[in-house]
Amino acid sequence: MTAEERMMWVERYSALPTGNVADAMDGLGLKRGSVLGLYPIDPSQKRAAGFARTVLQKRRSTPWDGVNLAKHGKVIDDKTEPGDLLVISMGGITDVSTGGDLLALRAKLRGVQGELTDGCLRDVDDIAAFDFPAYSAGTAPNKSAYDIETVGVDVPVTLCGVLILPGDMIVMDRTGVVVVPSGKIAEVYESASRIAKREERVVAHLREGKTLTESRKLAAAEVGQ
C-alpha cells in the first residue's frame, strides 16, 4: 500500500463513528473488534483512525542499571510512519506509565494519529493540548524506564481480549475503540459508510416529523440496506 493509499484510508475511517464500524463488522459476520475497558484521556478529544503499529512491553527482567529498555523514542523514530496509530500492550501493568507528553509530541510530529494502550499514561493535560488522541487504562505519574522493557515491535498483541495485528485499522472516538482486520478494511468501510449515510437520512426524516419506523423504511429505500 502506498503512502497516499494509507492516508486515504485514515481519512475515510476518521470520518466514521465507531458505532457504524462496529455495526458493519457485525453485519458482515466478522469477529467483534471492540476494545472494552479503556478510556480517552480527554473526553472531548477528536476521532482518530490509523494503522496499528504494535509494541509489546513487560516488566523489566533485570534491575535498573541506568539503561532504558522501554525504548519508546527509538520505536517512534525508527518504526513509525504517517498514518500509524501506536498500540502498546503492557499486559495490564498500571502502576507506571508507558509514556507521556514528550513521546506523544514526537509521535504526532511523525504523523502518528494517536495512541492506544492497556497501560497508563502521564502528562495527559499536555497530551490533550497537543491534540493527540489517546486511550488508556488510566493515568500514573511514574515513568516506565525503571520498570518496563520493550520485547517486541510489529508483533501480534492482545488488548482487553482483542487480538491486534500490525496493520489493522484502529478507530477511536468518544464512544470507544474498534479494530478492523487489515484484510477487511475496504469491505468494512463500504458497509460502514453506507450505514452512516442511511442514518443521516433517518435523522433528516425524523426532523421532518416522521416516526422512527417510517424514517428507517424511507432511509433504507433511499440508501439501501
Ranges and model annotations:
Residues 176-178:
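Channel- or pocket-lining gating/hinge segments that regulate access to a cavity or pore
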